Amino acid sequence: MGLRDNAIVGYAETKVMEKSDRNVWVLAGEILEELLDKTGVDKNEIDGLVMAGLTGTGAANPFWAQTTADVLGLEVGFCEQVHTGGCSAAGCVARAAAAIDYGMCEVAFLLFADTHVLEDRTDHSHTYRREWTEPYGLMGPPGAFGLLSRRYEVQYGLDYRMLGKLAVTQRNHALLNDNACEKLRVPITIDDYMNSRMIADPIRLLDCVMRADGAAGDRFGGTCHRSTVGRIDE
């Protein structure tokens, strides 16, 4: 079997919420239940779990993936978490495909769930950031992307309205997504973008994402399980 013999056979997501009314474990359970319902697979058939990204909630511990498997009642032979920032979801797919290809599991559950806003337990008072990054203004991703964008501007030139087009297009997509955060389902224009507050020059407020709560997941498997393929658009 090769990597191309694997497929996403089911997808589920909660609504993105400014602040959730359920904790991270409840959201994770909702995703699992929806995927089982969509794909018709029995929970006992899931033998792989791959968690995406980092969480700042009660699920935040070095054994997040193992803890989640225990809470959800999953008995898996392959269990890990992928920390690659904003591309963690894609990393999960690659990791699950490789695990199935090498015979480490047959049916994988890919999951991210977070209630960072509901259960904000962030404490940076004793981290490296206070000494090594915050004095230079790198207080989160916007600062780092500001430096990268400035370097690009110096070397190649940068049309700020081009960046605005990205923000406007993404917002327009959110307007079409029923699961998008309601607070952000409001159209914006290029002028709105250009007039938004500068955060880390040239990164503006409307370039940034805000913290939000929610969960999403995939059921991933090889061709031998395609008899239980669910409709992704359900």
Residues of each region from the PLM?
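Short catalytic helix/loop segments, enriched in acidic residues and glycine
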Residues: D21-T39, L72
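Acyl-thioester C-C bond-transforming condensing/cleaving domain
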Residues: V41-K43, A59-W64, L74-E234
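Short glycine-rich or small-residue beta-strand-to-loop segments that form or flank ligand, phosphate
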Residues: G48-T55, H83
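Active-site phosphate/pyrophosphate- and oxyanion-stabilizing loops and adjacent acidic/basic residues
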Residues: Q66, D70
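N-terminal alpha-helical transmembrane segments of multi-pass membrane transport
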Residues: V9, D42-I46
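Loop/turn elements at helix/coil->beta-strand transitions in domains of secreted/extracellular proteins
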Residues: L3-N6, D47, M104-V107
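A short N-terminal beta->alpha junction/helix N-cap motif
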Residues: K15-L27, A52-G56
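Generic N-terminal amphipathic, Lys/Arg-enriched alpha-helix
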Residues: R4-S20
